[in-house]
Amino acid sequence: MTIILHPGSVLLRDLATIYWTGVPARLDPSFDAGIVKAADRIAEIAAGNAPVYGINTGFGKLASIKIDSADVAALQRNLVLSHCCGVGEALPENVVRLMMALKLVSLGRGASGVRLELVRLIEAMLARGVIPVIPEKGSVGASGDLAPLAHMAAVMMGHGEAFFGGERLNGATALLKAGLQPVELAAKEGLALINGTQTSTALALAGLFRAHRAAQSALITGAMSTDAAMGSSAPFHPEIHTLRGHRGQIDTAEALRALLENSPIRQSHIEGDERVQDPYCIRCQPQVDGACLDLLRSVARTLEIEANAVTDNPLVLSDNSVVAGGNFHAEPVAFAADQIVLAICEIGAIAQRRIALLVDPALSYGLPAFLAKKPGLNSGLMIAEVTSAALMSENKQMSHPASVDSTPTSANQEDHVSMACHGARRLLPMTENLFAIIGIEALCAAQGVELRAPLATSPELTKAIAAIRNVVPSLEEDRYMANDLKAATVLIASGSLNESVSSGILPALEV
C-alpha cells in the first residue's frame, strides 16, 4: 500500500495512516508539471545576473552578498552541511517518515522550484525505508526547521546518517544499500529542502494523533470507572448537553451513554441510591473531555492546513515571479502544540481523579481500599494511583506554552521565532505519560467492576474488560506491578482498547 498525496488537499486520515503504519507515500503524477515549471524558472534566474534571495545570494544576515553563478551548486551544498547542527537523540522513525511526506506535499505545490529528481528521491527513500537520522533538538521554528531538515537533506546528498534495514548507517551507505544515488543540489534546492515547518508539523500531528487516541480510550475507562463506582448516568442525558450546544460535549455524552447502555450495575442502583450527585470527575466527563475533544478538532483543522502548506522561501508565484516572504514562521504550529498540551493535561487530570476515587473506600461506594481483595495484607493498586499522580504532575510541569518564549537569533535578522519544534516535541513524552495514566485507570476500573460481581457491567464495557484481561490478569493478591502497568500502557498506546468496543461509538477527530 502507498498513500497517494494530492498537495493542497491531503487529508488528516492519510497522514495518520503514514504515522501509525509507516506506509510509503508519493505524489500524484498530475503535480509533476507544476514542479517542473517552477524548477525551470529558478534555473533561468540562476543563469542570470540579477540577485534573488536564496538562489544566488547568501542566507539570513548574509543575504546581501551576491554569489557567482559558478558557485550556485556549492552554495546549496554548503548551506545544507553547515546547518546540520542538531543535537540530542534521534527522532522516532515514524515522525521522520511523516516529516518527509509533508516535505513532498510542500514541494508538490509547485512553488519551491526544485527539480523533479529531488521529489523522486524522497519518494524512493520512503518506499525503500531509508529514514534519515534527525537529532531531536536544534530548531526554533523560524526560519523553518532548519537544522532537522538539513539532516534530511544531507542524507539525500550522501552525507549524514540514516536508518536502513534495522541499522544506523552513514547516509551514502544507506542510499547505496537501498539502490539509490545521492543527488547534487542545484539552485535553491538546499534552501527549499531545509526551509519549512515540516519537522514541527510532523511532531504536532504525531502529538495530535496520540492525544486523540488517548482521549477515546479515556471515554472507555471513564465509563468503566463510572460503573465501578456505581455512578449515575443521568448527567449524560442528551438534552443537558444540547442545551449547552458544544459539539464535543454532545459527542462525549453520547459515547458515554453507548458504553454504559444495558449495564446491570447501573440498573441495580437507579432506585434507592442515597447519593444525590457524583463527584465532578464522574459527573462532568462530558464537559471536560468534550472540551478537550473540541480543542483537538480545532487544532486538527489548523494542522491539516499547515500540512498542505508551502512553507519555504522564496516562492515561485503563479505569475512566475519569485518573491521572498515568511511562510517558514511556524507560529500556527506552535499555537497548535500549546493547545494540544492543554487537552493532554486535562484528560490526564480528570482520569487521575477517577483513579483516586476508585482506590479510596470513602469515595468508591463499597469497594475495598485500594481495590485489594484483602486490604492490609495486600496494598492492591495503592502505588499505581501514586504513579498516576506523578505522571499527571509531570505533564503539568511540561505545559508552559512554548510559543510565548521567542528569542532573537541569527544576528537579529531572525528576531522573532516560534519555538514550535520543541513545543511539539514534548507532546510525545506527554502523551506517553497520558497513555500510562489511562492504562492505570483501565486496571483500576476493571478491578472495580469485577469486585461488583455477581453484578455485571454493560456489553460494551464487558468487551473492553476482556481486552484488558487479555494482557493483565485480575489482581488477586499483591504481585510485581511494573509489568502490569507497562502492558496497560501499551494497550492504550496501540489503540487496542479502542478497537475492543463497537465501531462508531468513540468520537472521531474529523467532523
UniProtKB/Swiss-Prot annotation:
SUPFAM superfamilies associated with the record: L-aspartase-like
Enzyme class at the top of the EC tree: lyase
UniProt pathway: Amino-acid degradation; L-histidine degradation into L-glutamate; N-formimidoyl-L-glutamate from L-histidine: step 1/3
Reactions catalysed: L-histidine = trans-urocanate + NH4(+)
Domain of life: Bacteria
InterPro entries on file: Aromatic_Lyase, Fumarase/histidase_N, HutH, L-Aspartase-like, Phe/His_NH3-lyase_AS
GO MF, one annotated term: histidine ammonia-lyase activity
Modified residues (2,3-didehydroalanine (Ser)): S143
Entry annotated with the keyword Lyase: yes
One GO CC annotation: cytoplasm
Keywords: Cytoplasm, Histidine metabolism, Lyase
Gene Ontology annotations of biological process type: L-histidine catabolic process to glutamate and formamide; L-histidine catabolic process to glutamate and formate
NCBIfam families: hutH (TIGR01225), PRK09367.1 (NF006871)
Name of this protein: Histidine ammonia-lyase
Gene behind this protein: hutH
